[in-house]
């Protein structure tokens, strides 16, 4: 069974197209994208009882995708180069991936 890893990326929304192109170049076709708020230098500003309040969080996207081990370093390098902004990437090894519909396991399930 070929090794696969879970790639997590926290990126600004404007970087999504560049990240998708980097994924496609390495045949990383499936991903989950969620709108979240994360730490940033600007933060979210609101007015509460006449005072401006900044919570230190900015809108961003969290992307999760399963990536084959042999391309994960190249994908991380390309995403890092493409985003060129505030963001985070982290990679987690996966012990087992199963495609529920077919029962395929490991890299075949990706």
Model-assigned labels for residue ranges:
Residues 1-110:
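Positively charged, small/polar-rich N-terminal and surface patches that mediate targeting and assembly
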């Amino acid at each position: 069974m070929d090794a696969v890893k879970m790639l997590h990326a926290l990126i600004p929304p404007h970087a999504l197209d560049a990240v998708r192109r980097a994924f496609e170049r390495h045949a990383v076709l499936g991903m989950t994208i969620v709108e979240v708020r994360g730490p940033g230098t600007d933060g979210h500003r609101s007015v509460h009882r006449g005072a401006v309040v900044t919570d230190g969080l900015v809108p961003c996207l969290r992307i999760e995708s399963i990536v084959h081990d042999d391309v994960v370093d190249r994908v991380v390098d390309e995403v890092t180069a493409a985003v060129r902004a505030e963001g985070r990437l982290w990679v987690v090894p996966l012990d087992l991936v199963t495609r529920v519909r077919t029962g395929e396991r490991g890299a075949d399930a990706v």
